[in-house]
Curated annotation (Swiss-Prot):
UniProt keyword Kinase, yes or no: yes
Name the record gives this protein: 4-diphosphocytidyl-2-C-methyl-D-erythritol kinase
Domain of life, per lineage: Bacteria
GO molecular function, one term: ATP binding
GO BP terms in the entry: isopentenyl diphosphate biosynthetic process, methylerythritol 4-phosphate pathway; terpenoid biosynthetic process
InterPro entries in UniProt: GHMP_kinase_C_dom (IPR013750), GHMP_kinase_C_sf (IPR036554), GHMP_kinase_N_dom (IPR006204), IspE (IPR004424), Ribosomal_Su5_D2-typ_SF (IPR020568), Ribsml_uS5_D2-typ_fold_subgr (IPR014721)
Major enzyme class: transferase
Pathway(s) it belongs to: Isoprenoid biosynthesis; isopentenyl diphosphate biosynthesis via DXP pathway; isopentenyl diphosphate from 1-deoxy-D-xylulose 5-phosphate: step 3/6
Residue positions of the active site: K11, D141
Residues the record lists as binding ATP: P99, V100, A101, A102, G103, L104, A105, G106, G107, S108, T109
EC number(s) per entry: 2.7.1.148
HAMAP family per record: IspE
Family from the record: Belongs to the GHMP kinase family. IspE subfamily.
Length: 316
């Protein structure tokens, strides 16, 4: 049996609007999700035994059942017990390049990669929609990570409508290593502060979703108009995260003054990004940020927007 190494890209949010509560306890969301080429490498190697083993040298990445990559493997075992009996388990090695606890879907994309890899190793022949159906059982971001590119995500984030790929722009990403924002905390706090704005009527939710589909940001994406996209970036979670984390708020303010098309926090944070027209501009802004904030706790990356989801890098 072949071993596979898969490229697992991270993602940013270009748009995140919280519409209301769902009966399942999650929030009703409208998001525009975008893959970036800052990616982990996930290697799946058949191990000849009836178990999964997970390896990662990054000290902040768990290697037990709390890791989404491990949970993805166990889900495949539960769904396809005959194939697990026939082919056995795999050793999963994560080469972690996406920052941890950053709002960039690093855990979700690792889980998506394991689904894709086991589909190949176990010769299941699952289609992308079938893989995304399994992915939705693992987490809201995992279905998007399977397909990648640019997409509108609704429901709790698992209902995807792919749109014209946006791969002509770059981003500077910045994150304080010591700061981690709890996603459940961010949504819970938003509910406490802003539930008077929530919509519960299904028709009104659908109407709001349609407004975003037909709205100016979608038009800017279709036209690949970076300047307009930058002006229309939106994230409701900034309303609760930035007041609670002044370092992140200061970082966002600093980056917004450096040029580029627009600056925003991604997801529940704490990563902040600036949209750029070129690699050269992104590198220049990265250098300016470093000159203005000398804190060694601050990490910076440059990445290109990507039209790719999980990809096989090596089979052998």
């Amino acid at each position: 049996m072949h071993a596979y190494t898969l490229i697992a890209p991270g993602k940013i949010n270009l748009y995140l609007e919280i519409i209301g509560d769902r009966p399942d306890g999650y929030h009703e969301l409208i998001m525009i999700l975008q893959s970036i080429d800052l990616a982990d490498r996930i290697t799946l190697r058949p191990n000849g035994v009836q178990q999964f083993r997970l390896y990662c040298s990054h000290p902040q990445v768990p290697t037990d059942e709390s890791n989404l990559a491990y949970r993805a493997a166990k889900l495949m075992q539960q769904e396809f017990p005959k194939q697990f009996d026939n082919f056995g388990g795999v050793d999963i090695t994560i080469d972690k390049r996406i920052p941890v606890a950053a709002g960039l879907a690093g855990g979700s994309t690792n889980g998506a990669a394991v689904l894709v890899g086991l589909n190949l190793i176990w010769q299941l022949g699952l289609t992308q929609p079938e893989l995304q159906g399994l992915a939705s059982l693992l987490g809201s971001d995992v279905p998007f990570c399977v397909s990648g590119g640019t997409a509108i995500a609704t429901g709790r984030g698992e209902q995807l409508d792919p749109i014209y790929d946006l791969d002509n722009l770059w981003v500077v990403l910045a994150k304080y290593t010591s700061i981690a924002v709890s996603t459940p905390w961010a949504y819970k706090t938003y509910r406490q502060l802003f539930n008077n704005t929530y919509i519960s009527d299904r028709e009104r939710i659908q109407a709001r979703t349609h407004q975003v589909h037909a709205g100016p940001l979608m038009g800017a994406i279709l036209q690949k108009d970076g300047a307009k996209i930058g002006r229309l970036l939106h994230n409701d979670l900034e309303k609760v995260v930035l007041p609670e984390y002044p370092q992140v708020a200061h970082l966002r303010e600093t980056m917004a003054k450096m040029g580029g098309f627009g600056t925003m926090m991604s997801g529940s944070g704490p990563t902040v990004f600036t949209l750029c027209e070129s690699y050269a501009q992104a590198e220049k802004i990265k250098q300016h940020i470093r000159e203005n904030i000398s804190d060694i706790d601050l990490q910076l990356w440059v990445a290109q927007l990507s039209n790719m989801g999980i990809q096989v890098e090596i089979a052998g």
